[in-house]
Amino acid sequence: MEYKFDREWILEPIGGDTGQAYVGYNDANDERVFLKRNSSPLLTILSMEGFAPKLKWTKRESSGDIMTAQDWVYGNVLSHFEVAQLPVVKLMYRYHHSDNLYNMLVKIDGDVYEPERFLQDYQSNLSKELRNHHFLTCVENCLWDTRHLVDGARKTVCHGDLNRRNFIRAEDNQLYLVDWEMVKIADPILDISQLLVQYVDFKNWDAWFDLYGLRITYDIYQRIEWYSMLNLLNMIKKDYQENRMMAMNHKILKLKHIYNNRYLQQVGEM
């Protein structure tokens, strides 16, 4: 369904969790752009540093909403296999270590997350069925009991929604990461483990760490376990909300593997 944005632009909604994204057509100039309502305030610097497609303009609507326009990128979303490869690792490393991005997020009072806040978010709007699920409750209790072991880690900019569909490779081979609405200041292991539990086999995690340049210590290993279990809990919660039971059960099996073999179990009993 198309509708007029102003005299120049016709908008057509495209898929997305927010329902605020559009393809914008300007027939007079034969131009196409990606339009989004109330996108991340980081968009300007994300565009400048090459993490996101070029920002073309912004416009305030009569409602007070801000509409942003970016270059329309002709390309493809990454496959399950491609997300685990070196270009994505390099991109993640760059934004995790970008002082400009971090300083801007601090300047605009970006959300700062400690382990306790992540657990509070998980509990928010959690269904009765999942609250009463014995195994998931055991995992959650483990995370509460061991949160002090992962607290106080160095924080960076974290994307927070590393789904393969948010990685776009343009026709010129430029790799972009889009949908920064869940960006936060947190332990970068949040992002790393989020990607690992979705797209990298357990047997290949060490090789992935080498690509990223992550030297595994006991401290880092505990954080990887903790955030891997947290991310899987959140994914299970979302699968349940969206009635994806097969996907949910697959993640529960993955979570059981991590939980039953966890180092945190030994630490928590000391």
Task: For the regions a language model picked out, list residue spans one by one.
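A general structural signal for well-ordered alpha-helical segments in protein cores
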Residues: 52, 92, 119-122, 205, ...
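Helix-rich C-terminal or lid/interface subdomains of diverse kinases
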Residues: 197-199, 211-270
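ATP-binding pocket architecture of kinase catalytic cores
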Residues: 11-105
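Active-site Asp-x-Gly
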Residues: 170-221
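An alpha-helical support segment within catalytic cores of ATP-dependent transferases
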Residues: 2-5, 100-160, 262-266
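Short, Lys/Arg-enriched, disordered terminal segments
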Residues: 1-17, 25-30, 249, 253-270
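A glycine-centered beta->alpha junction motif in the catalytic cores
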Residues: 61-81, 115-127, 229-245
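Active-site acidic catalytic loop and adjacent metal/ATP-binding pocket
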Residues: 21-24, 144-190
